[in-house]
Amino acid sequence: MLTAIDYLTKKGWKISSDPRTYDGYPKNYGYRNYHENGINYDEFCGGYHRAFDVYSNETNDVPAVTSGTVIEANDYGNFGGTFVIRDANDNDWIYGHLQRGSMRFVVGDKVNQGDIIGLQGNSNYYDNPMSVHLHLQLRPKDAKKDEKSQVCSGLAMEKYDITNLNAKQDKSKNGSVKELKHIYSNHIKGNKITAPKPSIQGVVIHNDYGSMTPSQYLPWLYARENNGTHVNGWASVYANRNEVLWYHPTDYVEWHCGNQWANANLIGFEVCESYPGRISDKLFLENEEATLKVAADVMKSYGLPVNRNTVRLHNEFFGTSCPHRSWDLHVGKGEPYTTTNINKMKDYFIKRIKHYYDGGKLEVSKAATIKQSDVKQEVKKQEAKQIVKATDWKQNKDGIWYKAEHASFTVTAPEGIITRYKGPWTGHPQAGVLQKGQTIKYDEVQKFDGHVWVSWETFEGETVYMPVRTWDAKTGKVGKLWGEIK
């Protein structure tokens, strides 16, 4: 007989927590009730720890103790970095506390006994302090499906023979089912930017009109918070074919639609890298599919149906081209924003969301994992890029005077101020209306068309222009400001 513990100890692993040494063994299997520094590490399972803790001082490489199929590979699972392999007997081997980002396989992959599945670590659900080690647990195939049973059930692996659970697996199709890398900002567990939403009534599928990946968005968004430009907009979720950034809790108000009701009741999902020419249409569609899969998971978690009332577009609430690239591909380039076309776009999103809502798997090409640099350093770089220094006025070829200026503007005009796309001219298409009391952060000032204007870039990459007072080009005299500048 060969047990998993025998297998690991022969490789030099040492046991740090052994159920055979707990009080009441074997009758009261796994009752440990371990406390340290005021923390009960077994509280969730009622004091039980039906698992072995082992560690190695020689290597962090964690080998699979049996062959099988990966059914979970989650950086933020119930045991922190959580990896689960189902063996030939249909029982599940749980490898817990792995280093986040270290897992070598994705859900659906085949694994052979001895394959390195990840790295020994100390991650955990609550981010409590703990020593580096491996939590190894054998969940029975007949465990109930509720969370507590899935987390707390455990067979006595010291009595479980793995001698014949080492059959070679066909790994030729590994990687065909995509498991996205999840990135979490400090706001998920820490401080929040806004208040809780009064209700969750649906989702909005955006295109970011940018070229950044989700991991690149995180330092960029932090930098905007630091310099105050985050008030110009952000969404809760950013996704592409490789990664998902959970920037802010989905049940908190977002600034993603330029519409008070939509911001307070709808969850924003950004399809990343949508800037024309940044990536091929094929790769963009993979980004779109990944985003719709995440949207389906979130909608299902809130018990939302999938229909035209719950799947919405940005251009339903604000004068914008968003979702511009999805629109070009599924409705047609240059097609007008009519009700018929809006419904055509929504119906496409609905069809794909339903596919994932009903259990469809995400299948995309295997792309290289994007390496994340130190976020603090990236924040500093992004802040440096976003700082705008005051300069003297310059004039461009169209006769527009402009200069860089970094400040905030709060509207005081009772009727609000109409904003424009394309440039500082009242004849350009209307972008929207900034209402009394609303504030934006701008980075440039222009003088043209009888007005002084300010402009800023939205979180979707579009520049918006707004007149803030009158201006006489002949005398240089300016009128009363229609708001407050700080």
UniProtKB/Swiss-Prot annotation:
GO molecular function, a single term: metal ion binding
This protein's record includes keyword Metal-binding: yes
SMART domains, per database record: Ami_2 (SM00644), SH3b (SM00287)
Enzyme Commission (EC) number: 3.5.1.28
Designated name of the protein: Endolysin 2638A
Function: Endolysin that degrades host peptidoglycans and participates in the sequential events which lead to the programmed host cell lysis releasing the mature viral particles. The N-acetyl-muramidase activity cleaves between N-acetylmuramic acid and N-acetylglucosamine bonds.
Domain named SH3b: residues: 406-474
UniProt family annotation: Belongs to the N-acetylmuramoyl-L-alanine amidase 2 family.
Cofactor note: Zn(2+) is required for amidase activity.
